[in-house]
């Protein structure tokens, strides 16, 4: 039996979180955990240890940059890859930057189920490539 990749979605839009959860879990390859604000998302990241965090940029109380900063400065969460989710940019802006801004992959809202799955798969391919490269350096 293949283990499912665990993804934590931190986004204040409950309907979007449910869309992501349904879309990714329907593939049978992902287990999706949802948190609707920054502080609870940080707590879930610390306890659940996901393989990827999908993090909204604009949220009340604590925005995505603040959440990412907190996670990146904690020993137990700093190695968890983060992909930002935003409706603040358009697809052309992100494509000009090859899908990355300041080293983080971006997923643009609104998004279709097919696009979401493709982009999450792409992020996991990058994660795997990075892990394999680091392992080859240690060998």
Task: Give a label for each model feature.
Residues 48-54:
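Active-site beta3 strand of CheY-like receiver
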Residues 11, 56, 86:
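Active-site residues of response regulator receiver
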Residues 59:
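Receiver (REC) domain active-site loop signature in two-component systems and cognate sites
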Residues 37-40, 63-69:
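Acidic catalytic/metal-coordinating carboxylates
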Residues 29-36, 44:
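Short hydrophobic/Thr-rich beta-strand motif most characteristic of the beta2 strand and flanking loop
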Residues 18-26:
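Charged docking surfaces used in two-component/phosphorelay signaling
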Residues 66, 78, 89-108, 114-121:
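Alpha4 helix (beta4-alpha4-beta5 surface) of REC/receiver domains from two-component response regulators
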Residues 125-139:
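CheY-like receiver
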